[in-house]
Amino acid sequence: DYGLFTGALAGYLEKVGAVSTKDPDRDRLIVKSLLTGEANWIIFPEGRMVKNKKIVEKGQFMISWAGGKHPPHTGAATLAIRTEFYRRRLRRLAEEKPDEVEYLMDLFQIESLEPVINRHTYIVPVNLTYYPIRARENILSNLASRLVDNLPDRALEELMTEGSMLISGVDIDIRFGDPILIGECLECTIIESDIRAERRINFDDPVASKSAMRKEALKLMQLYMTDIYNMTTVNLDHLFASMLRFLRVKQIDEGDLRRRVFLAATRIQQHAGLHLHSSLKEDPIHLLTDDRFGIADDFITIALEKGNLQKVNDRLIKDQATFTSAYDFHRARIDNPLDVIANAVEPLTQLQRTV
């Protein structure tokens, strides 16, 4: 996030290898390091961190953020395709056009050609699921506020959320999908023609195959987006939040809510296609008895604090508006964490049908 590249924090981020999203040389640097294999890159496929986790609308990937809605960006796919384009171009022209190869090696600061042309480019889908998600002030957010003048609200929110995860303790489930080899998408005639073209092609020069590569990037994006969100690790917060969102009655007894989540949990355990948090792999009978892990109590406490629920005469009154009203995108995880939690499992059709 370019908003973090200010003051003392900017120097630190540059030293550890982070690149601002507004760095004019960003794409060439990424392609160069992918060609040489000196670095791998972590890229948000949505184009930015989706704090509200709202990435599906009417069955299609659609990102909702402070500026409106848009399909997921194809940045990761485009960079992977551009990398493999130049790798194949170097391989193809190594003997036929040595002067062009020399130019490209200089452009990308490549010292040795052999390792570059013998590598391949992959996209590895990765999913990180945090449990529980609770945003609050912490030592990291306080420190950043002192180091950076006028720290942007969105950066502060990220530090409050991620900082709390690191300091207070949180389970992080990391899942890696099958690597996607970038290669087949470059085999159409028009792209092949540009790869073997003998004319000089500078990094930002327009090429005839630009439209074809754009289409391939869109297909590639759909592939890894599906893989990423299908790897979400389902936890009890997801079930409670989804159950509360879809609850058709306006009020409910706490015991009834817990029984519904218990039933959903036992059914979810039978779905082989879902990834479950360790707590969901065990018998959830505690939801019906003493709630000895405090999971139901903690969820309901948060729901009451954030206004999703009100408690009247031992009954829980649901405020449906908290699941449908617009809210500040950059404060989503602070102001409405339950909506964020429910959004995170929206792409999982098996779970949605069960709930």
Regions found by a protein language model. Name each.
Residues D1-V355:
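Membrane-interfacial terminal anchoring regions of lipid-handling membrane enzymes
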